[in-house]
Amino acid sequence: MATTAIVGGTGLVGSNIVNILLSSPNVAHIDFLARRPPSTPVTKDLIESHPSKFASYISTDPPSSWASHLRSTSPAPEIFFSTLATTRATAGSLAAQRALEHDANVDLARAAKEAGTKVYVLVSSAGADPSSKLPYMKLKGDIEKSILDLNFEKTIILRPGFLSGQREERRIIEGMVGVIGNAAGWLSKPWLKDWWSNDAVEVARASVSAGLAALKGTEPDGQQKVRILAGKDIVRLGRTERKEAS
């Protein structure tokens, strides 16, 4: 069974990843690093049902400072999940957003590798590109490049579109696009919504499924060192390959 760690586990996708990991018989341990403990009733119930499986490190210090805990955690995480992200409005500036999203992600990824992590799973964004003129897409692309430079045994990058689902911290733009995406799917075909909007639970299922497959060496296309999932790949894994995540 796999040992895991996650940062960003209180967010929309991250909280669903935590729930899936807690429910999975293929996962032995979850190290949860966050500013606050899980707060959803579903997660709390799952933790109560699997108390020996879950360990939390709660700190209000900057996430980059959590690296020392990660290096010494036991058991060492074989799979590391990162959904760590924020908005410029929440961070206060583009520089502050970069410090959290890029610098903290890279510092924690480096610490995970030093601790013995074999598989790194990053939830990024559609359009991520280090050469993009759009600050957000460039930021996401820079994160991906820096993670790839760390040269994990296996790296999985998911690039979902706008995320739909119930989040604690409502983001206005994502909410509007999610409504439009849902309407498009209802009025036309489900694949139309899937083209630009991804359900957070499906992204979480795809993340866990791909991570476990990479650790086992059962990826569909063989032993892939880097696997990038977007659009239909996320939908396929999230909807039809649940066995890997359960």
UniProtKB/Swiss-Prot annotation:
Q: Which residue windows are coiled coil? A: none
Q: Where in the cell is it found?
A: Mitochondrion outer membrane
Lipid bilayer topology: Peripheral membrane protein
InterPro entries the record matches: NAD(P)-bd_dom_sf
GO (cellular component) term, any one: mitochondrial outer membrane
This protein's UniProt keywords: Membrane, Mitochondrion, Mitochondrion outer membrane, Transit peptide
Q: Which SUPFAM superfamilies match?
A: NAD(P)-binding Rossmann-fold domains
Q: Where is the transit peptide, renumbered to this chain?
A: 1-37
Asked if the Swiss-Prot or TrEMBL record annotates the protein with the keyword Membrane, the reply is yes
What's the family? Belongs to the FMP52 family.
Name by which UniProt lists this protein: Protein FMP52, mitochondrial
- The source organism is Coccidioides immitis (strain RS)
| Gene (UniProt) | FMP52
